[in-house]
Amino acid sequence: MLQGKRQAMSVFNMAWNSNKFFWDGRAHLLRDQAILPIQDELEMDETLENVLSKLSASQMYKDQFTRVYGDDDITVDKMALAMEQFMLSIVSYDSKYDQWVAGTTELTASEERGRLLFETEYNPFFQELSGADCAHCHGGSNFENDLYMNNGLDADADFADLGRENVTNDPMDRARFKVPSLRNIELTPPYMHDGRFSTLEEVVDHYNEGIHPSTSLDPAIQATIETGLFLTSDDKVDLVNFLKTLTDHSFLTDTRYSDPF
């Protein structure tokens, strides 16, 4: 059995992604992202020609392509555009956090403390005022910044995946990966680009006390290496509880995404 080296990224709210696709940004457009896994030997290990042949043999798909494009000539471009449009329709915006923002529900005391930790910057001078500084990378309404960053998983000598550098050939992009959205993060283990952490608690521990220095490490994370984030056991529990408020249960049960036919 072939073993991949990267964890699959979530596919929702893609319309707000303006800085290429995949962990390393090798796909410029979402329609490009749609067809690359088909041909990847570690994923579907198929050929586009074979996929087109299968689709063309299905009357259901021929009818669908005729309805959309005016004829039943199934091509790679049409297939990619159709998948792109479907993925653009997948949106998640009704988590408990969103309901709290709208004023229709309340966060628990633990969730609220976690939110404040999430949004408060690291403060090396006043520990009691320091937060987890999560919003530095995972800010905004989609809880990501659409950038490629090195989050301190490994030291230079231990990089098993060069990440964005494989695309740009820029050494400063070494081990930098796309910052993912934290929406629905409770339901998408394992975590990090290589799936090395099984739980959110492990992820929090990494940022609190497990950062490895390297040449391309994000400066904000670099600043925390000597002291860590000062998070207590209770802080960690609160932070994870807040992250779980980002789960959108209506999105998870929306049949438009699980059974579009």
Model-derived segments and their meaning:
Residues 45-124, 139-144, 225-261:
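Post-cleavage N-terminal segment of exported redox proteins
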Residues 18-73, 182-185, 193, 216-231:
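Axial heme c-ligation environment in periplasmic c-type cytochrome domains
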Residues 1-36, 98-206, 211-219, 254-261:
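Short glycine/threonine-rich turn/loop motifs
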